[in-house]
């Protein structure tokens, strides 16, 4: 539930890792 960081930030651009199931949360990409 968004507790595992994906090692990507989403301050300026969306999460590229969203293709792998990650989502932006608090300017950092987390895996759902």
From Swiss-Prot:
Keywords: Disulfide bond, Knottin, Plant defense
Crosslink feature (Cyclopeptide (Gly-Asp)) location: 1-32
Superkingdom as given in the UniProt entry: Eukaryota
Tissue: Expressed in leaves, flowers, peduncles and seeds (at protein level).
Family: Belongs to the cyclotide family. Bracelet subfamily.
Note on domains (UniProt): The presence of a 'disulfide through disulfide knot' structurally defines this protein as a knottin.
Function: Probably participates in a plant defense mechanism. Reduces growth of and increases mortality in larvae of D.saccharalis. Kills cultured SF-9 cells of S.frugiperda probably by disrupting plasma membranes. Has hemolytic activity against human erythrocytes. Has no antibacterial activity against E.coli strain ATCC 8739 and S.aureus strain ATCC 25923.
Protein name per UniProt: Parigidin-br1
Upper taxonomic lineage: Eukaryota, Viridiplantae, Streptophyta, Embryophyta, Tracheophyta
């Amino acid at each position: 539930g968004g507790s595992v960081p994906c090692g990507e930030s989403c301050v300026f651009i969306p999460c590229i890792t969203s293709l792998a199931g990650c989502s932006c949360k608090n300017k950092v990409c987390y895996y759902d």
